């Protein structure tokens, strides 16, 4: 896996709702902190809440949410952070557009697909959204009455059978060259100041 000497990186965690994206992001963030790397989590739900103009759940709204998250991730990566985006981002074309923008800006982009079967997501259902969608109380629910387009060639696939901690450790090993680069650049920036 070739890494060049650019600041920052974007790890884009995608998967069905309740696939484990936020939990993996939190576990990975802790591991990165433990080795002195600067990381920031951008959670799709939190980003939606923070918007001044709320978005709905049409394809256009979802694509706009992905676009906005991508722009914010690039802004954070400018400071040399490893930005972990945990977001359903159900449409390939929107993820592909963010990938191209991030790479064109000179940052690493690593798509991580949490391959969790919908049956497991329905069992987890921490917000009760699958239950509402299955009862006809909620429309536009990704995986039930709205599509989720799995990545065709993600850099990393995490299977649902892994614990959040083991999945984070696996991902940490995979991005280790980037972590070394990030912490080295942080030391160099400190010396320059």
Which residues does each PLM region occupy?
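Residue-level preference for the first positions of well-ordered beta-strands
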Residues: 8-12, 38, 82-84
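Small-molecule kinase domains that catalyze NTP-dependent phosphoryl transfer to phosphate-bearing small molecules
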Residues: 115-118, 123-172, 176-193
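Walker A (P-loop) phosphate-binding motif
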Residues: 3-30
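ATP-dependent NMP and nucleoside kinases share a basic, alpha-helical "lid"
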Residues: 50, 54-56, 73-134, 140, ...
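Helical mechanochemical/support elements of P-loop NTPase systems and associated helical scaffolds
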Residues: 61, 65-69, 94, 137-140, ...
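Conserved substrate/cofactor phosphate-moiety recognition/catalytic segment
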Residues: 19, 26-78
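Conserved beta-strand scaffold positions in the cores of enzyme catalytic domains, especially
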Residues: 10, 41, 109-111, 155-157
């Amino acid at each position: 896996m070739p890494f060049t000497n650019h600041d920052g990186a974007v790890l884009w965690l995608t998967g069905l709702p309740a696939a484990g994206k936020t939990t993996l992001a939190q576990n990975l963030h802790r591991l990165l902190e433990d080795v002195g790397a600067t990381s920031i989590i951008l959670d799709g739900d939190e980003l939606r809440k923070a918007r001044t103009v709320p978005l709905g759940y049409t394809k256009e709204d979802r694509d706009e949410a992905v676009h906005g998250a991508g722009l914010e991730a690039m802004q954070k990566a400018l400071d040399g952070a490893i930005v972990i985006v945990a977001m359903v981002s159900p449409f390939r074309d929107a993820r592909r557009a963010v990938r191209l923008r991030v790479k064109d800006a000179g940052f690493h982009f690593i798509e991580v697909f949490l391959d969790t079967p919908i049956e497991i997501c329905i069992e987890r259902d921490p917000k009760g959204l699958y239950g509402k969608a299955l009862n006809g109380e909620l429309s536009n629910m990704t995986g039930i009455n709205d599509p989720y387009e799995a990545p065709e060639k993600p850099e990393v696939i995490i299977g649902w059978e892994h614990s959040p901690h083991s999945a984070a450790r696996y991902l940490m090993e995979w991005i280790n060259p980037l972590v070394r680069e990030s912490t080295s650049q942080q030391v160099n920036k400190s010396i320059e100041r």
